[in-house]
Amino acid sequence: MANKDYYEVLGLQKGASDDEIKKAFRKLAIKYHPDKNKGNTEAEEKFKEINEAYQVLSDPEKKSNYDQFGSADFNGGGFGSGGFGGFDMGGFGDIFDMFTGGGSSTRRRNGPVNGNDIEYTVTLTFEEAVFGVEKEITVNRSESCEHCNGSGAEPGTSKKTCPTCSGTGQVRVQRQTPLGSFVSTSTCDRCSGTGNIIEKPCTHCRGNGNVRKTRKINVNIPAGVDTGNVMPLRGQGEHGLRGGSPGDLYIRINVSPSKEFTRKGNDIYIDTHISMAKAALGTEITVKTVEGNVKYTVPEGTQSGTLFRLKGKGVARVNSTGKGDQYVRVIVDIPKGLNQKQKEALYTFMEACGEEMDENTHSFKKNLFGRKK
């Protein structure tokens, strides 16, 4: 690696600390490892340079000499014909485990496998969501085969240990590369990673251990749920394999809107219409709530759009105590198509209030009372 700057190879500045050198090497070793870049000669050369640079910069004595005299003193001293030569990979075994099968990237498939979760959407009416309801749902899920008790083998027969992988579910393959000998681990093709061979598969589940079943499940939905809420039913999902735990069933709630009420959190809103005269004089109205009708006194002088609160008449708080409130919005209706008597009354009301009339209003009044005479 003639005239190469080892610090530059690792993406570092001269004088970098030991910790910085280790971190840089770790990152680059993963990126350019030959097993991750099969057939890529450029990556292979880059990997070789990275290791050569690390051999020097990770050794205090070599690093000191390099800092004083440069890389020329170490050219050709990196890798011998035996692969990595004297390079010490101590402390970096976890990097190479992912390529050699020693780390967590290789999964064993002969142990218990947990079942998958299931999601099911339930649509409720507004009232069902407010008061709570019991719903029967139908779920299609994978369950342990009763015929073979989930073993996958026909009753009266048994499994045998896979002779290829000796029951581990994995096989190790040694390969020679320009950088030396590498051992990789892969799933055993003969037993598909289970570690066992089923000589006579179960006639019901065909050796799988699980079968599809349609089940009816009663779900108790509490009062106060709303659209977007999710209820977990533990252990009601897909069954596991080889003794694995079952998954969960998640009930996603969807609530149909009400024609009369609007819901915001645990509060309910409703509009009620009253006449202009009742708004001015005050009146008693009947208000519909989710629990039935109640009486409410609207005070005189109420303006259109005014909100009145009915405390505790809202929706129950899920898994808690108390309820929200109901808000009543008063809409004051302005009359249309007034008859002569109604108009006269309004003109009289305007005069009683001391309101000034513009020319058009005065003209209408004159014509109106003129016709009366």
Swiss-Prot record:
Gene, per the UniProt record: dnaJ
Domain of life: Bacteria
Cofactor binding note of this UniProt entry: Binds 2 Zn(2+) ions per monomer.
Cysteines joined through disulfide linkages: none
Zinc finger extent (CR-type): 132-214
Name of this protein: Chaperone protein DnaJ
Transmembrane helix is among the record's keywords: no
GO cellular component: a single term: cytoplasm
Domain note: The J domain is necessary and sufficient to stimulate DnaK ATPase activity. Zinc center 1 plays an important role in the autonomous, DnaK-independent chaperone activity of DnaJ. Zinc center 2 is essential for interaction with DnaK and for DnaJ activity.
A GO molecular-function descriptor: unfolded protein binding
Subcellular locations according to the entry: Cytoplasm
Self-association state and partner proteins as the record states: Homodimer.
Chain residues that bind Zn(2+) 1: 145, 148, 202, 205
Domain J: 5-70
InterPro entries assigned to the protein according to its UniProt record, in alphabetical order: DnaJ, DnaJ_C, DnaJ_domain, DnaJ_domain_CS, HSP40/DnaJ_pept-bd, HSP_DnaJ_Cys-rich_dom, HSP_DnaJ_Cys-rich_dom_sf, J_dom_sf
